[in-house]
Amino acid sequence: MAMVACGLSVLLAAAAAEEYPHAFPRAGTKQLFDNERVTAWEVHWLKDTPQPIHRHRFDMAGVYLRYGPIRVTSPEGVVSPDRPPFEVPRPYFQKKGVTHREEAIGFSPDAPERMAVMFDVKDKIVDPIVPPEGMARAFPRDGANKAIDNDRVTEWDYTWKVGQIVPTHQHDKDSVQVFFQGGSIKFTAANGKVETKTFNFGDARFIPRGTIDSEEAITGSPRAITIELK
């Protein structure tokens, strides 16, 4: 009888855990785009706004664009210790299954509001493309810093400089890109087509694997975190 009761308790606990909503959407979030590889979210930890306990049902990759203090609480009510401020942009990765509440409640009115762009990384796995002979991959490249590398993603921090051309390359993996500093970049495709795009702080985009181009900053010093999906 005791074993039956114990088993029932385990099942009830598992069922309760399954009832937690996914981390997104919630107050302060906006979906940017969605495809077979990722769902992109702009996330603001709104001040003095209660949030539900939620469960991250996907691996999550992203980048914090602005620091702000938050309080993290487990389903059991345990509050994590406050952490010191961090520099931005801050690349981030978290495995699925994390369950908690994140709130910016009880801090100074002058405290900044945390902001990030986060990606739910879906379970679909896609093999990388082998670039044509003699053609470089998009990453690594000169000046790019590898911030995170694991079995799901590689995250690169890179700043374009005016007049400095990134030679023709192929994105061998599907990638997402989040801009921390804005500016305009000229892209020259394999067929010679030229397109100039202007990016602002917080902009995010998806780059399909197989994309071939060269890049050159035209204005500003665009800086972005590029997340290659494995």
Predicted segments with their positions:
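Glycine- and acidic-residue-biased ligand/ion/polar-headgroup-sensing regions
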Residues: 57-76, 172-191
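Ligand-binding loop in jelly-roll beta-barrel domains
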Residues: 96-122, 182, 208-230
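Cleaved targeting-peptide boundary
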Residues: 15-22
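Short acidic-glycine-tyrosine-enriched beta hairpin
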Residues: 34, 76-97, 193-209
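Bacterial N-terminal signal peptides
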Residues: 2-13
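A short glycine-rich, His/Asp/Glu-containing loop-to-beta-strand
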Residues: 25-53, 57-65, 138-168, 172-177
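Surface-exposed beta-loop interaction hotspot
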Residues: 106, 113-151
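Short histidine-centered beta-strand/loop micro-motifs
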Residues: 51-56, 81-83, 103-105, 158, ...
